C-alpha cells in the first residue's frame, strides 16, 4: 500500500485500529475522514512548533484551503510509520476504541526516533574551544607555535583579528 496522501495516512491509522480496511470491505464516512485529516493536521502542527519541534517534511495546508484527504503529505519515508501510528492513538477515542499496547509502543518509539533524527540534523560540528591547549603530542602545531586550538573562525576571513580594539 502506497501512502502518498493525507487520506492514505488516515486510512493506515484506521486499518491499525481495525476500523476500516480493504480486507473487511468497510469504508469510512466522509465526515469521519475529514475529522481525522483535521486531527492529523493538528498533530503535525503540535510536533512542528513553528520549526522548533520535530522536522518531518509534512506539508501543511494554507489558510485559505482546509486540509483535504487528497493532499500530498510530503513526509520523509522514515516518518510515515511513526505518524500514522501516533494518529491511530489520537483518533482511537473517536471510535470508542483503545489503541493496543503494540500500537502505543510503536507510536512512542517512532516519535522518539523522529526527535533523535531532528536533533542530529540540527546539531553542528563543534570545534575545540580556543582556550583548549593542543597538547605536547601534537608536534606540527607546536612547530608552528600553535599552543591552543583556533576555536571558531571568523565568518568573514578579511576581518582583522584586532578589529574593534582601537
UniProtKB/Swiss-Prot annotation:
GO process terms (BP): symbiont entry into host cell via disruption of host cell envelope; symbiont entry into host cell via disruption of host cell wall peptidoglycan; symbiont genome ejection through host cell envelope, short tail mechanism
Compartments where located: Virion
InterPro entries (alphabetical): Gp4_sf (IPR038258), Tail_accessory_Gp4 (IPR020362)
Keyword Transmembrane helix: no
Main subcellular location of this protein, as a coarse class: virion
Pfam family, one: P22_Tail-4
GO molecular-function terms, A-Z: hydrolase activity
Keywords: Degradation of host cell envelope components during virus entry, Degradation of host peptidoglycans during virus entry, Hydrolase, Late protein, Lyase, Viral genome ejection through host cell envelope, Viral penetration into host cytoplasm, Viral short tail ejection system, Virion, Virus entry into host cell
Domain of life: Viruses
GO terms for cellular component: virus tail
Entry annotated with the keyword Hydrolase: yes
Assembly, per entry: Monomer; homododecamer upon binding to the portal ring. Interacts (via C-terminus) with the portal protein; this interaction participates in the head completion. Interacts with the Tail hub protein gp10. Interacts with the tail needle protein gp26.
Domain observations: The N-terminus changes its conformation when transitioning from the preassembly state to the postassembly state.
Biological role stated in the UniProt entry: Tail protein that binds the portal ring and functions as a head completion protein. 12 copies of gp4 form a structural ring at the bottom of the portal ring. Together with gp10 and gp26, gp4 is required for stabilization of the condensed DNA within the capsid; perhaps by plugging the hole through which the DNA enters. Plays a role in ejection of the bacteriophage DNA into the host cell at the initiation of infection. Functions as an exolysin that catalyzes the cleavage of the glycosidic bonds between N-acetylmuramic acid and N-acetylglucosamine residues in peptidoglycans.
Protein name (database record): Head-to-tail adapter protein gp4
Higher taxonomy: Viruses, Duplodnaviria, Heunggongvirae, Uroviricota, Caudoviricetes
Amino acid at each position: 500500500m502506497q501512502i502518498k496522501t493525507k487520506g492514505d495516512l488516515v486510512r493506515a491509522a484506521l486499518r491499525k485500529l481495525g476500523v476500516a480496511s480493504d480486507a473487511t470491505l468497510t469504508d469510512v464516512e466522509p465526515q469521519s475522514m475529514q475529522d481525522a485529516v483535521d486531527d492529523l493536521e493538528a498533530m503535525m502542527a503540535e510536533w512542528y512548533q513553528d520549526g522548533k519541534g520535530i522536522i518531518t517534511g509534512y506539508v501543511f495546508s494554507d489558510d485559505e484551503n482546509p486540509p483535504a484527504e487528497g493532499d500530498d503529505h510530503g513526509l520523509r519515508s522514515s516518518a510515515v510509520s511513526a505518524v500514522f501510528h501516533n494518529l491511530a492513538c489520537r483518533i482511537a477515542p473517536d471510535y470508542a476504541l483503545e489503541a493496543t499496547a503494540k500500537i502505543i509502543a510503536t507510536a512512542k518509539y517512532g516519535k522518539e526516533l523522529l526527535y533523535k533524527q531532528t536533533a542530529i540534523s540540527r546539531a553542528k560540528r563543534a570545534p575545540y574551544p580556543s582556550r583548549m591547549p593542543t597538547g605536547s603530542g601534537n608536534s606540527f602545531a607546536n612547530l608552528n607555535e600553535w599552543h591552543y586550538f583556533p576555536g571558531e573562525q571568523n565568518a568573514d576571513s578579511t576581518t582583522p583579528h584586532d578589529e574593534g580594539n582601537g
